[in-house]
């Protein structure tokens, strides 16, 4: 048993009425697509067809399910995806009974419930609706903006066949003037904007100096004439040219008009009013509003009287962290010694005009290596990035002399300049840690975090886990990155001590899915890295996927593991969707495990009393036979292994947190700079 005791918590969930007989027997629709799509495109296309068909319709297997009768649906039409146009036709096949006790069939009913919620929210009057969020009361107002209070909602079906509603109070800041009017008041450019005539949002790149009457578009019309032909200028001034981009493809600038755009505001944009807005809610007030909104939704949507859901929760045992001896946090290892250290050479690059290592940094490093029983050589780079090839030569010589990582002391730099410098150093195989000056010895948290990041980039293992866990190898998979390309990244840790094995990246690919073959290629690399260190393959592997697991994404990898005789567990880790937890009595703390239905559980990995209502991770055990509590125990302990944070722990387990950092850093720097970088060095922390 891995828990220290149990308690009871309230969830921000409410039980509503049971499904009626018709809702348990949705219409089934066969889908024919012409031309037939490729394997990777089938499910996204079916989801697109469901939206095009209208009504309360969702994907079910290789067809559709609907709570709307076929006669009100759009049974044929065309749609486009990835540059290809498809014709679709739907054939009604009668009603199909679905059993809410069957996880697969319940997932279809839950998808229908979610679509029903969307459709009914859209029909509400006097409220602002965005997807599954509804805002109904004004909280604050200022010149040209207002803040609405409401909630983000979710609706699904329980295994008993009843609707379950989730409510999370939220705020929405709305701008009530065009971008042109907002800028005329002297405000800076917002980061995002939306169309004044619909809800589509854009990244705002810059203002243009072009004349909108003269700026030609591909169809032959000018920018101004194009919008006039769509009827968008009636009652509106066109304004100036603004260049925007789709958030999914920010490298492709699109011309727009400032009079047809509305700023999407954040608290940062309203920083002068931030103190008076008071948008953070104490947990007692959040829970009160949650109950109030649930009652309102139940009445307005005809879903019955909500009943608050309670759940049993278990406090997991606290991880035991080891440096040279037991520590409570990674920063302690700078004083007692690292878990695993070897002879190391570090270099300093100063861009602030000063010379040499600051004495307190030099002293801290020498003390840490002395406590670790390892030797340390400190170098100084006498070159500047502005020297071009001479700087590259200095880096090459440092690498030949055994330097493993570089600390850069610099005045604050623009992000573009930081990324350019980091990429230049990586090209020579030298990960870098950038630390802004001025820097004072009493700023211990700041410079100790920087030193820990530097040491991780040099390949040292600062801390380890002490204890026994089900999996000997944990691998995190994430798809993310910059612009329209994404990188499926894997970062892994050995279960016995949490030591980093390697990072690995495939070629860039489009979309949020990682192709089956790429998943296996990534996993195979980590298995070989484990074998090189241990002399054998692991007996069990823990596979952690950031977000939902697309259907069949891991099918090839799981088949290969089974052939090799390696046991496995596949867990989907979702940063959102876990809702909130409230104590029935007393207080909550880190390591709270809340088992739910269908191999699903909540895990509160990090909680600070002064930071509002706890937000647990939502985890789904997609495949494998390890008991949920044992999985929760290992995953919770893995959150303590992020080496570059000396005083606080991340919310995600280390393999996923590292994979997330990896794909984001590669998105910023590009993949071409990594050929000389050792796979065991965490250049991205």
Curated annotation (Swiss-Prot):
Name by which UniProt lists this protein: Protein argonaute
Region (Linker L2): 272-337
Temperature dependence: Optimum temperature is 55-70 degrees Celsius for cleavage of gDNA:target RNA hybrids, increased cleavage and background hydrolysis are seen at 70 degrees Celsius. gDNA:tDNA cleavage is enhanced at 75 degrees Celsius. Activity on 98 nt tDNA occurs at 20 degrees Celsius, but on plasmid dsDNA only occurs at 65 degrees Celsius or higher.
InterPro entries listed in its UniProt record: Ago_mid (IPR054763), Ago_N_thermus (IPR054764), Ago_PAZ (IPR040895), PAZ_dom (IPR003100), Piwi (IPR003165), RNaseH-like_sf (IPR012337), RNaseH_sf (IPR036397)
Gene3D superfamilies: 3.30.530.60, 3.40.50.2300, Ribonuclease H-like superfamily/Ribonuclease H
Effect of inactivating the gene: Increased competence for naked plasmid transformation, increased levels of plasmid DNA. No substantial change in gene expression. No effect on natural cell-to-cell conjugation. Wild-type cells outcompete deletion strains by nearly 2-fold after 12 days in rich medium. Increased sensitivity to gyrase inhibitor ciprofloxacin, increased adundance of ter-mapping DNA in immunoprecipitated TtAgo, cells are longer than wild-type and form filaments with thin DNA filaments between cells upon ciprofloxacin (a GyrA inhibitor) treatment.
One Pfam family it belongs to: Ago_N_2
Region (Linker L1): 100-176
GO terms under biological process: clearance of foreign intracellular DNA; DNA replication
Extent of the signal sequence: none
Cofactor: Mn(2+)
Residues engaged in binding Mn(2+) 2: 478, 660
Job description of the protein: A DNA-guided ssDNA endonuclease. Uses short ssDNA sequences as guides (gDNA, also called small interfering DNA, siDNA) to bind complementary DNA target strands, resulting in cleavage of the target DNA (tDNA). The cleavage site is 10 nucleotides (nt) downstream of the target residue base-paired with the 5'-end of the gDNA. Plays a role in completion of DNA replication, participates in decatenating replicated DNA and plasmid. Involved in defense against invading mobile genetic elements. TtAgo interferes with plasmid DNA, stimulates expression of specific endogenous genes, including various CRISPR loci and at least part of the CRISPR adaptation machinery, but only when exogenous plasmid DNA is present. Upon purification from E.coli associates with gDNA 13-25 nt long with 5'-phosphorylated ends and with 10-150 nt RNA with 5'-OH. DNA corresponds to the expression plasmid rather than chromosomal DNA; 89% of gDNA starts with dC and 72% has dA in the second position.
Phenotype upon changing residue 172 to A: Reduced cleavage of target RNA; further decreased
Residue numbers binding Mn(2+) 1: 478, 546
SMART domains in the record: Piwi (SM00950)
Domain notes: Has 4 domains (N-terminal, PAZ, Mid and PIWI). The N-terminal and PAZ domains are joined by linker L1, the PAZ and Mid domains are joined by linker L2. The domains assemble in 2 lobes; the PAZ lobe consists of the N-terminal, L1, PAZ and L2 domains, while the PIWI lobe has the Mid and PIWI domains. The PIWI domain assumes an RNase H fold and has the catalytic residues. gDNA lies between the 2 lobes, with its unpaired 5'-end anchored in the Mid lobe while the 3'-end anchors in the PAZ domain in the absence of target or if target nucleic acid has not fully base-paired with the gDNA.
Domain Piwi: 507-671
Applications reported: Can be used to create artificial restriction enzymes using denatured tDNA and providing appropriate guide DNAs. This is particularly useful when cloning a region without any known restriction enzyme sites. Addition of UvrD (TT_C1062) enhances cleavage of supercoiled plasmid DNA in vitro. Addition of engineered thermostable SSB (ET SSB) allows cleavage of linear DNA and GC-rich DNA and enhances use as a artifical restriction enzyme.
Residues the record lists as binding Mn(2+) 3: 685
GO MF assignments: DNA binding; DNA endonuclease activity; manganese ion binding; RNA binding
Active site: 478, 512, 546, 660
Species of origin: Thermus thermophilus (strain ATCC BAA-163 / DSM 7039 / HB27)
Record note on cofactor: Binds 3 Mn(2+) per subunit. Target RNA cleavage occurs in the presence of Mn(2+). Prefers Mn(2+) over Mg(2+) for tDNA cleavage. tDNA cleavage occurs in the presence of Mn(2+) or Mg(2+) with a slight preference for Mn(2+), no cleavage occurs in the presence of Ca(2+).
Keywords noted in UniProt: DNA replication, DNA-binding, Endonuclease, Hydrolase, Magnesium, Metal-binding, Nuclease, Plasmid, RNA-binding
Region annotated Mid domain, chain positions: 338-463
